[in-house]
Amino acid sequence: MLKTVRAARRPPLALRLAPTIVPLLMLRFAAAGLAAQSAAVEESRARADVSAVLDALHEAASEADFDGYFSLYAGEAVFLGTDATERWTREAFMDYTRARFETGTGWTYHMLERHVSIAPNGRTAWFDERLENANLGETRGSGVLVLEDGRWKIAQYNLTIPIPNEMAREVARRIRALKGG
C-alpha cells in the first residue's frame, strides 16, 4: 500500500521574510528620524544666521557703518521706507545713506520681537520684526533674505509704522488731505 506523505507546511511568506524585513524597516525609520532631526537642526541654524544678519544690520546702522551696513544687502536689494514714495534700489539707498553716515549719524532701532521663516529649499528666508525707535516709536521691519555664496543677504527690507486700527481712518484722511485729496 502506498503511504501518503504530506509535505510540511511552510510558514507564510511574510513570516519567512520577517527576520530580514523587520531590521531593514527599523533602519529605514531610524534613518528617516535622523534626517528629520538633521533638517530641523539646519533650519534652526539658518534662522539663527538670518537673525544675526538682522542684528548686524541694526548695529551697523546705529554706528553709521556704511560699508558694514551695505555688505549685508544683496546686489539687487530694494529698501522700502515709511513714506509711500520711498522705494530704493541698493544703489539709490546707498546714495541717500552715504551723506548721513559720513556725518557719523545713523539710526537706531531696538528689536522687540522677531519671527524668521526658512523656505523648504533652505536658500530663502523671510522675517518680520517689531522695532523701537526714539523718533518714530514702534515700527515694523519685514523682508526677504537669500543665501548667496553661503552668506545670507537682504534682498528686500520694508520699514513701516504700524497704525492702531482705531486710528487708521483718521490717519488715512490726513494723508489724503496732505496730498490735496
Question: Where do the protein language model's features map onto the residues?
Answer:
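Hydrophobic pocket/interface hotspot
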Residues: L57, Y69-F70, A77, F93, ...
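Bacterial N-terminal signal peptides
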Residues: R16-A30
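Short beta-edge strand/loop motif at the mouth of beta-sheet-based domains
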Residues: W88-R90
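Short, low-complexity N-terminal intrinsically disordered segments enriched in polar/charged residues
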Residues: L27, A32-G75, R123, E166-G181
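N-terminal secretory signal peptides that target proteins for export/translocation
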Residues: M1-L15
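Solvent-exposed loop/turn segments at secondary-structure junctions
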Residues: E76, A84-E86, L131-A134, L159-P162
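Short beta-strand edge/turn micro-motifs at domain boundaries
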Residues: E138-R169
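Surface-exposed, charged secondary-structure patches
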Residues: E42, D49, F79, A92-E138
